[in-house]
From Swiss-Prot:
GO cellular component, one term: cytosolic small ribosomal subunit
Family stated for the protein in its record: Belongs to the universal ribosomal protein uS3 family.
PANTHER family from the UniProt entry: 30S/40S RIBOSOMAL PROTEIN S3 (PTHR11760), SMALL RIBOSOMAL SUBUNIT PROTEIN US3C (PTHR11760:SF19)
UniProt gene name: rpsC
Protein purpose: Binds the lower part of the 30S subunit head. Binds mRNA in the 70S ribosome, positioning it for translation.
Keywords, sorted A to Z: Ribonucleoprotein, Ribosomal protein, RNA-binding, rRNA-binding
Subunit structure and binding partners: Part of the 30S ribosomal subunit. Forms a tight complex with proteins S10 and S14.
Protein name: Small ribosomal subunit protein uS3
GO terms of molecular function: mRNA binding; rRNA binding; structural constituent of ribosome
Signal peptide span: none
Domain KH type-2: residue ranges: 38-106
Length: 225
């Protein structure tokens, strides 16, 4: 099961929090579609800015968008011009004021989505895919991960038949739910068609603190009483 399912979705509530932080009964469908449109717009707008995560928080009077990127200068622009322009464009997706927070990713070499985007970009630039994959593996291991796996699929080097190749260093325990597994996916658009890039990184196991364990015990006791 761990080999097939998205490792982030499998660990929601265990090692990873939700990317959409809100709850609604009546407007669930409306809010969900707004979130999808906002994410697609920002990913397309800043496709070269290495955006690794977009977290959307909803409040009664406003919406907060937290954009995690390794290139904040490219997103913000000169004197914040890009942000103001984006805020104006985002107004058409929601009927509430939208605020944006730009959060810099300090170590993009260990973030799976950033690695996937780097590999896809170099494949589009016709770099040898094996050299690119091995270089990113070494960079991630030097960055401090305990394991990393990179897999690419498609017409590699323009071959007539599509195939899959993968390289791995360290260990990536996909079946261990407490393992902090990050996952990234990106498609490289080449003259021979699309090449899919998948990346898994493992940065150790998650063990809750005593305070978190006490909170869990209290929550279970409250549900059963």
């Amino acid at each position: 099961m761990g080999q097939k399912v998205n490792p982030i979705g499998l660990r929601i509530g265990i090692t990873r929090n939700w990317d959409s932080v809100w709850f609604s009964k009546q407007d669930y469908i409306k809010n969900l579609h707004e979130d999808i449109k906002i994410r697609r717009f920002l990913q397309k707008k800043f496709k070269n800015a290495s955006v690794v995560k977009i977290i959307i928080e909803r409040f009664p009077e406003k919406i907060n968008v937290n954009l995690h990127t390794s290139k904040p200068g490219m997103v913000i622009g000169q004197k914040g011009q890009n942000i103001e322009a984006v805020k104006q464009e985002l107004k058409k997706f929601a009927d509430k004021p939208i605020g944006m927070n730009i959060i810099e990713v300090k170590k993009p070499e260990i973030i799976a989505q950033a690695i996937a985007e780097t590999v896809a970009l170099q494949i589009e630039q016709r770099m040898p895919f094996r050299r690119v994959m091995k270089a990113e593996l070494r960079r991630a291991m030097r960055g401090g991960v305990e394991g990393v796996k990179i897999q690419i699929s498609g017409r590699l080097n323009g071959a007539d038949m599509a195939r899959t190749e993968k390289y791995m260093e360290g260990r990536v325990p996909l079946h261990t739910l407490r393992a902090k597994i990050d996952f990234g996916f990106k498609e490289a658009l080449t003259t021979f068609g699309q090449i899919g890039v998948k990346v898994w990184t493992y940065t150790g196991d998650y063990f809750p603190t005593k305070e978190e364990s006490d909170e869990d015990k209290y929550a279970v006791k409250r549900r059963t009483s």
